[in-house]
């Protein structure tokens, strides 16, 4: 049986909030089987809890942001979400003492190390997957995102299209099948990116105060401003794929399907997830009693994190 997964022990890290520029402490705690992924604002009294759901995402302008009916928010959840999805985690309490997850280095890599350092253990309950049964597609202008049936895992195909001398056509597309190994080795270190003109505007209105060359790739009109350059030649499209993995995991379950996107972002990713879940014929819950019949990425994942 493919079993649910949680952490062996609690772990914490302190970093900077991308928008506030202030110190943020993130604590990850194990949770019982069938709890799901639950975010919590522990700086509030009483603490405010946000179970992972597509509907909790109510702001996607600059990141993926959970907001409840009282206006309480937790921003920038997508990179941590992507790390949890890649490791097949099912049950976790994510505590944060600020309105945002720390940005760390702008990638998912620090979260991967944090989770692996805590250790991952199986629980005595079957892991539920969402398996796609019908194709669902959403569009906004020339941008689109689509999910088709595919039972062997989560297949990903992402294309970006920026007019910039540093973004040539051969680094605008990336394809990958999600597994812990593929995620860790191929895209986990891909950092968020932005343009200098956007940074200047955001900081002028009190946003992105924690943004710097230490946690983002910054481009001007002609070049990349980071002295160390890129971590991968196609780092930008890989980060957009990383974002989409995190955005799709807001349902709280690993998805079995074939995802493809052109110029998609947080908003369109969330729109796709909502459209899938709203169509009861488009998906179903499945479990796997026989490990040999399970998606390969979840059969061999233990080798990565034990």
From Swiss-Prot:
It is an enzyme of class 3 (hydrolase). GO terms for cellular component: membrane. Keywords: Hydrolase, Lipid A biosynthesis, Lipid biosynthesis, Lipid metabolism, Metal-binding, Zinc. Its EC number is 3.5.1.108. Pathway: Glycolipid biosynthesis; lipid IV(A) biosynthesis; lipid IV(A) from (3R)-3-hydroxytetradecanoyl-[acyl-carrier-protein] and UDP-N-acetyl-alpha-D-glucosamine: step 2/6. The keyword Lipid biosynthesis applies. InterPro entries: Ribosomal_Su5_D2-typ_SF, UDP-acyl_GlcNac_deAcase, UDP-acyl_GlcNac_deAcase_C, UDP-acyl_N-AcGlcN_deAcase_N. Zn(2+) binds at residues 79, 239, 243. It catalyses: a UDP-3-O-[(3R)-3-hydroxyacyl]-N-acetyl-alpha-D-glucosamine + H2O = a UDP-3-O-[(3R)-3-hydroxyacyl]-alpha-D-glucosamine + acetate. Its cofactor is Zn(2+). Signal peptide: none annotated. GO terms for biological process: lipid A biosynthetic process. SUPFAM superfamilies: Ribosomal protein S5 domain 2-like. The keyword Hydrolase applies. Gene3D superfamilies: lpxc deacetylase, domain 1, lpxc deacetylase, domain 2. GO terms for molecular function: metal ion binding; UDP-3-O-acyl-N-acetylglucosamine deacetylase activity. NCBIfam families: lpxC. HAMAP family: LpxC. Catalyzes the hydrolysis of UDP-3-O-myristoyl-N-acetylglucosamine to form UDP-3-O-myristoylglucosamine and acetate, the committed step in lipid A biosynthesis. Belongs to the LpxC family. This is UDP-3-O-acyl-N-acetylglucosamine deacetylase. It comes from Actinobacillus pleuropneumoniae serotype 5b (strain L20). The lineage of its organism: Bacteria, Pseudomonadati, Pseudomonadota, Gammaproteobacteria, Pasteurellales.
